[in-house]
Amino acid sequence: LRADTAKNLSGESIPGDSFPGFKKNKISVVTREPLGVVLAIAPFNYPINLAASKIAPAIVAGNSVILKPATQGSLCGLYLAKVFEEAGVPAGVINTVTGRGRDIGDYIVTHKSVDFINFTGSTEIGERISRLTTMVPLLMELGGKDAAIVLADADLDLAATNIVAGAYSYSGQRCTAVKRVLVVDSVADALVEKVKALVS
């Protein structure tokens, strides 16, 4: 997917009359240029997938990357960097820094060489990064409050099954895991009993 996307990274031109009030004899030109150094901060729950989804587009766009894997995923991050190296990515294009976020986090997100930050993690840390960084573009995927919504006409057996699967699959360590259930009062007690039966 990332390699295919790379084939379409080209400039564009937009006729001036595409915008109200602009003249036909003018055009807008869009060029795509590398940002420079992308800091990719990956979470623990999908240490390869989410790191690769940050690294690949950055490289395809001509940037170099500093990968900061989660402490619990440091070995995965180091091995992933090795895979890119063995695939022919030149030395220095992907760099990996490991350590606890509380020890090195503030330093790396405020480093003067970082031109863009791509972070996946908690809302709390995302807010901290946002406060610490000044004029550095940010792309963040932060923790959610994912809800299952159950209405009065729902199939309660199916709803209970999906709630349990949504909450407990992958040990609940997914950003999209069900974290709360919003259910109408008329079926709440029955739903609770069905969920309890599935998890006991």
Segments from the language model and where they lie:
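Short coil/turn connectors at secondary-structure junctions
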Residues: 26, 32-37, 61-63, 90-92, ...
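PLP-dependent aminotransferase-like
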Residues: 51-105
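Periplasmic-binding protein-like
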Residues: 56, 115-120
